[in-house]
Design a protein with these regions (language model features):
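Serine-esterase "nucleophile elbow" of acetyl-processing enzymes
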Residues: 1-55, 61-63, 78-81, 167, ...
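Alpha-helical cap/lid subdomain in secreted, periplasmic
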Residues: 38, 46, 70-212
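Short secondary-structure transition/capping motifs
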Residues: 29, 64-68, 102
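Short aromatic-enriched loop/helix-cap "lid" or pocket-rim segments at secondary-structure transitions
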Residues: 16-20, 62-65, 141-145, 184-185
Length: 212
């Protein structure tokens, strides 16, 4: 069985911007048959296992003073241990790093992702890793800790992540080439976006011809 780790933030977890807030103090999650990870699992079949490790608010390597445990670099070693063996990995982080509180540049965010990538490379061959640059942020995200600079930085990540993928010989995919953020919050995938991202990820995974 080929085991693929999907490591990311709320767009890997499956945050639903439509139903969010319908029940006070809760986060609403798309069901498995809508999430791109769930669709990927169904498409790959019983001989594969998609290990969903998404967390709302997760960053590449920043500590969020308002939300504990969101540093992706710090969490990754334990997650890798808990999910062994891992044959392949998909990593999509960077959206939360664009928050105005961090004031990070695209290069700084990419440096954080590189540290995560190095951890993945300790257990997964580069040709079995898919690096995904996140969605472009939209103005609706201003109500959730983002600003004009955040939007600009989110649009630079595609270029810098592609350079990083080339540096380490991993596969690359830009989520922004296939989906747009919801108009409701400017940062999360819609149902249609999950389907579109799944189709792109599946194509990449199949072309990678992962061996276990």
């Amino acid at each position: 069985m080929k085991r693929t780790l999907a490591y990311g933030d709320s767009n890997t977890w499956g945050f639903d911007p439509v139903t969010w807030g319908s029940v006070p103090m809760t986060l609403e999650r798309y069901p498995e048959d809508i999430r791109w990870t769930g669709l990927l699992q169904k498409a790959l079949g019983k001989d594969a296992l998609v290990l969903e490790e998404g967390l709302c608010g997760r960053t590449t390597a920043f500590d969020d003073e308002e939300c504990d445990g969101r540093n992706g670099l710090m969490a990754l070693p334990a997650i890798l241990k808990a999910n062994q063996p891992i044959d392949a990995a998909i990593i999509m982080l960077g959206t939360n790093d664009c928050k105005s509180a961090f004031n990070a540049s695209s290069k700084e965010i990419t440096a954080g992702l590189e540290l995560c990538l190095k951890k993945l490379l300790d257990v997964v061959a580069p040709e079995n890793i898919l690096l995904i640059s996140p969605l472009y942020l939209e103005t609706a995200a201003f109500d959730f800790g983002f600003n004009d600079r955040s939007i600009a930085v989110s649009r630079e990540l595609k270029r810098d992540y592609k350079e990083l993928a080339d540096k380490y010989n991993t596969a690359f995919l830009a989520a922004s080439d296939h989906a747009k953020a919801s108009s409701l919050d400017g940062q999360h995938l819609t149902e249609e976006g999950h389907r579109a991202l799944f189709e792109a990820v599946l194509k990449s995974i199949v072309s990678m011809n992962i061996k276990n």
